Regions:
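C-terminal and inter-domain tail/linker signature
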Residues: 1-142
Length: 142
């Protein structure tokens, strides 16, 4: 018999995997359904955004400028299921200029990334994304 903590841990891992599965399908509403209404989204080298409307605006910016798929996703979670971490490899194409970044010319890139999650009442309450922005810039500049 498994202790409850292990099942809670499994649910946290499944939640994060569901989030990334929705991402890879381009299912923005599906991603949002997994988030708390007051979700905190901490962008790599960017501002902290709070709430589903801010997250939806972020998704629109991403969809306009990038086509991305995440591969080799590995998710770990605390036994109590309140925290999780993910590591992945981003395979992307830069399709339209994003403010403050080099011009887009359909450049392809592959780079590692990761994220940390806080999970509250079965929903994602915080996402902190990390990747090497300078590495990405070097890849798209060629």
């Amino acid at each position: 018999m498994k202790i409850d903590g292990t099942r809670t841990q499994d649910r946290a891992i499944e939640l994060v995997l569901d989030y990334y599965s929705a991402f890879n399908r381009g299912d923005w509403p599906g991603m949002q359904a997994l988030l708390a209404d007051d979700v905190i989204h901490e962008l790599n080298e960017g501002p902290r955004e709070v709430g589903l409307p801010a997250f939806a605006a972020f998704q629109q910016r991403m969809a306009r400028s990038y086509r991305e798929q995440l591969h080799d996703i590995v998710v770990m979670a605390t036994q109590d299921g309140t925290r999780a971490a993910a590591e992945y490899v981003v395979h992307g194409e830069y399709i339209a200029d994003d403010e403050g970044l080099p011009p887009a010319r359909g450049q392809h890139y592959v780079l590692p990334g990761g994220a940390f999650f806080a999970i509250e009442e079965g929903r994602i309450g915080r996402i902190s994304n990390y990747y090497n922005l300078q590495d990405w810039i070097a890849k798209v500049r060629g």
